[in-house]
Amino acid sequence: MASEHIEHKLALLPDKPGCYQMKNLNSQIIYVGKAKNLKNRVRSYFKSSHEGKTAKLVSEIADFDYIVTSSDKEAFLLEITLIQKFQPYYNIKLKKGTGYPYIKITNEKDPRMEIVSSVRRDGGFYFGPYPNVYAAEETLHFLEKVYPLRRCNGFQGRPCLYYHMGQCLGACFQEVPKEEYDQQIAKIKSFLRGNVAKIKQSLQTKMQKASEAMEFERAADIRDQIHYIEVTVEKQKIISNDSTPRDLFNFYLDKGWLSIQIFFIRQSRLIKREKRLFPIATDVNDELSSFILQFYNNKNKVLPNEILVPSGLDNKIMAEILGVPVRTPQRGEKKNLLELAKENAQITLEEKFRLMELDESKTTGAMKEITDALGIPEGHRIEAFDHSHIQGSELVSAMVVFTDGKPDKKMYRKFKLNTVDHADEAASTREVIRRRYVRLLKEKQSLPDLILMDGGDIQLNAAKDVLVNELSLHIPVAGMVKNDKHKTSDLIFGSQDQRVQLDPKSQGFYLVQRIQDEVHRFAITFHRQLHAKNSLASQLDLIQGVGPKTRNKLLKSFGSLNKIRDANLKEIEELGIPEKVAKTIKVSLSVHGK
């Protein structure tokens, strides 16, 4: 239900076009939308029932603002500006820097071809986009051999290497007539638009003549050029009977997710397909319109001659903003292309859902399998503990956290044991459990739903003893037991330490296995780090003149014996260490190294 403050603002909304900004309790803009009628659109958020992401959006709205515009077109433009400025959480946002390469013919006296990643209004001719840099480079290399322009830096008084190779018209040493450039550029444009039959026939004739003249290297080069045409141009499926450059957008919506497909059609061929997936909160037509305008604004790309979209969008306004026709075909080839894009969008979204289901079975589903097997309420967080030591010395413990079946590494913790000086699993468990949960209680932090101990009944009962008898906590605790091959086997749980078997092929079993492996890895890694540090410190302590302060300076600055050994005297003395002590360090470590 809307607050009294919002109800008052709703009553004042005008019947005019504009943009609205939804805000949360912190006055952050969480959604920007446009409306032909602000009063109707904004009121619909609070006067209708919603599901999914829209319901979540509405639940977070604490206030809203709006800006009236003079037309729908202005509202479109303002919406894009506001989205890019505030990056609201619930809006579809496109990442910058995701453009594709283009081939450019420069607008110069002696034009040249190059690959660029953005389009500028500089009078140049741009063709693309290409699916990747490799495809653009392959095309450029072909054009430079077959339709050369200028490859050198310009006039230098003598022919360049490329001129001798037939890949430059000679601006390096002579005046090249504009007509000659114009002819070449016309041929390049024709080729890029898909007219390849003439050049293929010409190349085949040249290859035949080169072979007859026994110029086999040249013939092989021409053969490669013909091969490029065959595999790169001719084998692309022709999907349109006209060569108009066009982009095509369509979508599929299901379960609050929007799947968008973009087809790039050039040279009567589908040269590139993009797909995007977004959870959406509002009207799909508004979201798609916003996406299309951001798409062209962010990519700073060459606009096609035509954009095809599904019905329901305001084509007229988008066409005015973009400066190219935006059309919805009703029949024929273009309509079929739109249907193809929609079919692809549906396939992409269904694949997304299947992956989400699989991920859920491995995470939250696996967590539920474990809690069901133990007969405890469903939960979200598991904390697992393991100990590590070397022959009873340098005792440490480690804790890993899994939330909804996924490792939460920022919650991992390491413990140097303070009250245990020998290998004692029960004492080690008591100390680490006591330290962990006393702290959580003092800081009033949330407790886990399940604790797993890597070990058997010794660790399990020690943990339960501290939790119940010292801290009055009743967190479920289970032990992770391994078989004789040191592989995850069962859980032990309950007052009688009963064995709880999980199906070895179940996701719950795999999750226990991952947790056990992860806590063991984390404990071993911590122990090795500590051992290496202690070993290094002890070796430095044996050097005459090196006390705790000097040792800590060396450790902090160099980090390892090898780095200290490789340092020169000056570097050691710069730490404030006397020359005599520095020399002793160098000599001692040198002897030790040998």
From Swiss-Prot:
<dbReference type="GO" id="GO:0009432">
    <property type="term" value="P:SOS response"/>
</dbReference>
<keyword id="KW-0228">DNA excision</keyword>
<dbReference type="InterPro" id="IPR004791">
    <property type="entry name" value="UvrC"/>
</dbReference>
<keyword id="KW-0267">Excision nuclease</keyword>
<dbReference type="InterPro" id="IPR047296">
    <property type="entry name" value="GIY-YIG_UvrC_Cho"/>
</dbReference>
<dbReference type="InterPro" id="IPR035901">
    <property type="entry name" value="GIY-YIG_endonuc_sf"/>
</dbReference>
<dbReference type="InterPro" id="IPR000305">
    <property type="entry name" value="GIY-YIG_endonuc"/>
</dbReference>
<dbReference type="Pfam" id="PF02151">
    <property type="entry name" value="UVR"/>
</dbReference>
<comment type="subunit">
    <text>Interacts with UvrB in an incision complex.</text>
</comment>
<dbReference type="InterPro" id="IPR038476">
    <property type="entry name" value="UvrC_RNase_H_dom_sf"/>
</dbReference>
<dbReference type="GO" id="GO:0009380">
    <property type="term" value="C:excinuclease repair complex"/>
</dbReference>
<protein>
    <recommendedName>
        <fullName>UvrABC system protein C</fullName>
    </recommendedName>
</protein>
<comment type="function">
    <text>The UvrABC repair system catalyzes the recognition and processing of DNA lesions. UvrC both incises the 5' and 3' sides of the lesion. The N-terminal half is responsible for the 3' incision and the C-terminal half is responsible for the 5' incision.</text>
</comment>
<dbReference type="Pfam" id="PF08459">
    <property type="entry name" value="UvrC_RNaseH_dom"/>
</dbReference>
<dbReference type="Pfam" id="PF01541">
    <property type="entry name" value="GIY-YIG"/>
</dbReference>
<dbReference type="GO" id="GO:0003677">
    <property type="term" value="F:DNA binding"/>
</dbReference>
<dbReference type="InterPro" id="IPR001943">
    <property type="entry name" value="UVR_dom"/>
</dbReference>
<dbReference type="InterPro" id="IPR050066">
    <property type="entry name" value="UvrABC_protein_C"/>
</dbReference>
<dbReference type="InterPro" id="IPR001162">
    <property type="entry name" value="UvrC_RNase_H_dom"/>
</dbReference>
<keyword id="KW-0234">DNA repair</keyword>
<feature type="domain" description="GIY-YIG">
    <location>
        <begin position="15"/>
        <end position="92"/>
    </location>
</feature>
<dbReference type="Pfam" id="PF14520">
    <property type="entry name" value="HHH_5"/>
</dbReference>
<dbReference type="GO" id="GO:0006289">
    <property type="term" value="P:nucleotide-excision repair"/>
</dbReference>
<comment type="similarity">
    <text>Belongs to the UvrC family.</text>
</comment>
<keyword id="KW-0227">DNA damage</keyword>
<dbReference type="InterPro" id="IPR010994">
    <property type="entry name" value="RuvA_2-like"/>
</dbReference>
<feature type="domain" description="UVR">
    <location>
        <begin position="197"/>
        <end position="232"/>
    </location>
</feature>
<keyword id="KW-0742">SOS response</keyword>
<dbReference type="Pfam" id="PF22920">
    <property type="entry name" value="UvrC_RNaseH"/>
</dbReference>
<keyword id="KW-0963">Cytoplasm</keyword>
<dbReference type="InterPro" id="IPR036876">
    <property type="entry name" value="UVR_dom_sf"/>
</dbReference>
<dbReference type="GO" id="GO:0005737">
    <property type="term" value="C:cytoplasm"/>
</dbReference>
<dbReference type="GO" id="GO:0009381">
    <property type="term" value="F:excinuclease ABC activity"/>
</dbReference>
